[in-house]
């Protein structure tokens, strides 16, 4: 593949066309530096409202604002050339009406340069999804555990582990699919349910605590790098950077206190200026 082809930005329709094909690789990112590192290796980068908890120390995603999503979304877009960038619509920015949802989504896309938005909810949000898609906004759905609803759910525990709840989530996924979502995130649901949804809906599914049968997978970058304090069951740590960072900081602190840093190679010598020769 040519370098020119490599530089082309992946689009929502291209992700939608991946149903049943090569698995879709997704991760979160909240700033340009990590986004740049991810860009060559992933298909989708989600600027998730999880940034409230990961980057800003919030207890839940509920306090996250549209302005926060735009700032982080813009940074991620700047750091990438290839991956599809999807930005979460935060709690309270799209639920009241279809018009509110469109204005928020349009603002996010225009001010960040992202290629799609994501919103949470099943049947209750299906008409909103349809309204957005009909007006040119690519929408990624999200069913199962929906963190924005934590105050009504009561916990971050897995969903769909009994027949009644599984039936509700299945109907939610069907509704979002029929409304035109180009993909659907399945978060923290029973594996057989994730497998069944993947088999039954037309858009590709992206699992996070779902099933290996999903059409793709996503994780929070900081969790898989070993930087998260509370790591869910569905996370595999591919690195353990937390202790490495702490060790590096401790070494730096020791050297500063011992005045061994900065050493000579880290400092600048004065520029020597040759004096003009004296006339004889």
From Swiss-Prot:
Tell me which Gene3D superfamilies the record gives: Phosphoenolpyruvate-binding domains (3.20.20.60)
The entry marks the following residues as binding 3-methyl-2-oxobutanoate, namely 49-50, 88, 118
Recorded catalytic activity of this chain's protein: 3-methyl-2-oxobutanoate + (6R)-5,10-methylene-5,6,7,8-tetrahydrofolate + H2O = 2-dehydropantoate + (6S)-5,6,7,8-tetrahydrofolate
Which GO terms fall under molecular function for this chain's record?
3-methyl-2-oxobutanoate hydroxymethyltransferase activity; magnesium ion binding
Task: Tell me the pathway.
Answer: Cofactor biosynthesis; (R)-pantothenate biosynthesis; (R)-pantoate from 3-methyl-2-oxobutanoate: step 1/2
Positions that bind Mg(2+)? 49, 88, 120
Query: What does the UniProt keyword field contain?
Result: Cytoplasm, Magnesium, Metal-binding, Pantothenate biosynthesis, Transferase
Q: Where in the cell is it found?
A: Cytoplasm
User: What InterPro entries is this protein classified in?
Assistant: Pantoate_hydroxy_MeTrfase, Pyrv/PenolPyrv_kinase-like_dom, Pyrv_kinase-like_dom_sf
- What are the record's GO terms for cellular component? cytoplasm
Family per similarity comment = Belongs to the PanB family.
Summarizing the function annotation, the protein's role is: Catalyzes the reversible reaction in which hydroxymethyl group from 5,10-methylenetetrahydrofolate is transferred onto alpha-ketoisovalerate to form ketopantoate.
Protein known as: 3-methyl-2-oxobutanoate hydroxymethyltransferase
Gene encoding it? Answer: panB
């Amino acid at each position: 593949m040519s370098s020119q082809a490599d530089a082309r930005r992946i689009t929502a329709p291209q992700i939608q066309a991946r149903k049943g094909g090569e698995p879709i690789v997704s991760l979160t990112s909240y700033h340009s530096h990590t986004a740049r590192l991810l860009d060559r290796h992933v298909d989708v980068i989600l600027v998730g409202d999880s940034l409230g908890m990961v980057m800003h120390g919030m207890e839940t995603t509920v306090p996250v604002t549209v302005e926060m999503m735009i700032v982080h979304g813009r940074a991620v877009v700047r750091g990438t050339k290839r991956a599809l960038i999807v930005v979460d619509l935060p709690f309270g920015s799209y639920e009241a009406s279809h018009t509110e949802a469109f204005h928020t989504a349009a603002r996010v896309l225009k001010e960040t340069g992202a290629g799609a938005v994501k919103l949470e909810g099943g049947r209750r949000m299906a008409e909103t999804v349809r309204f957005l898609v009909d007006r040119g906004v690519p929408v990624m759905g999200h069913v199962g555990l929906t963190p924005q609803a934590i105050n009504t759910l009561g916990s971050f525990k897995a969903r769909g582990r009994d027949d009644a709840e599984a039936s509700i989530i299945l109907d939610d996924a069907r509704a979002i699919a029929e409304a035109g979502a180009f993909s659907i995130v399945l978060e923290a649901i029973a594996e057989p349910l994730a497998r069944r949804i993947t088999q039954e809906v037309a858009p590709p599914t992206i699992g996070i605590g779902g099933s290996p049968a999903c059409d793709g997978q996503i994780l929070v970058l900081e969790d898989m790098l070993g930087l998260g304090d509370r790591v869910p069951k569905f996370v595999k740590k591919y690195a353990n950077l937390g202790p490495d960072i702490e060790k590096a900081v401790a070494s730096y602190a020791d050297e500063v206190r011992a005045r061994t840093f900065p050493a000579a190679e880290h400092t600048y010598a004065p520029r020597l200026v040759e004096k003009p020769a004296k006339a004889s």
